[in-house]
Design a protein with these regions (language model features):
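Acidic catalytic/metal-coordinating carboxylates
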Residues: 43-46, 67-75
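Active-site beta3 strand of CheY-like receiver
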Residues: 54-60
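Short, flexible helix-to-coil linker/hinge segments that flank and couple to helix-turn-helix
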Residues: 98-104, 108-109, 114-165, 169-173
């Protein structure tokens, strides 16, 4: 909160290997008074340094990057204090396995790069407030993967002990709605 009672803007770090994409996201977020970009990096290794030096409220990262990709970065963050910073995966990959793996590794949100500015800002604010976000169009495949009975009829099993941020029964129930 600011001195006049307004909420402070959410501080964001953008990690994406495509410079033009980072510039575009930064420019779009600058249109909102509710979010401020405090740092950016072109790969996961540089991203870890930027996170440590800026202490953002939310980290926004791509999955596929040189030197250290998004999933490897999430693995690396798990053992650090920065693991408490909500992470939003913003990517072009709508693969169910990638989504589930990112969530298992601690990502709190997953959006495709075709979202609107309003959707992106709302997702950042939701994560900063402690919530989770998965782009609505992606939930159908996730629900099938998380369902009790896949098409083969054999129950699926997931190891919920892999991550402290694994989906809870209630979160799965909400996804099914």
């Amino acid at each position: 909160m600011t001195a006049d009672g307004e909420r402070s803007p959410v501080r964001v770090v953008i990690i994406d290997d495509q410079h033009l994409v980072r510039q575009g996201i930064r420019a779009l977020l600058a249109l909102s008074s509710r979010v401020v970009v405090v740092g950016e990096a072109g790969d996961g290794l540089a991203g870890l340094e930027v996170i440590a030096s800026t202490r953002p409220d939310v980290v926004m990262l791509d999955l596929r990057m040189p030197r250290m990709g998004g999933l490897d970065m999430l693995r690396e963050l798990r053992g650090r204090a920065a693991a408490l910073i909500p992470t939003l995966v913003l990517t072009t990959f709508d693969d169910d396995e990638a989504i589930l793996e990112a969530m298992r590794l601690g990502a709190r949100g997953y959006l495709l790069k075709d979202v609107t500015l309003d959707q992106l800002v709302q997702a950042v604010e939701t994560l900063a407030a402690g919530g989770r976000v998965v782009q609505p169009g992606l939930t159908a495949g996730l629900l099938e993967r998380l369902g009790d009975q896949p098409a083969s009829g054999a129950p699926r099993s997931f190891d919920a002990t892999e991550s402290p941020d694994s989906l809870t029964d209630r979160e799965i129930e909400v996804l099914r709605l």
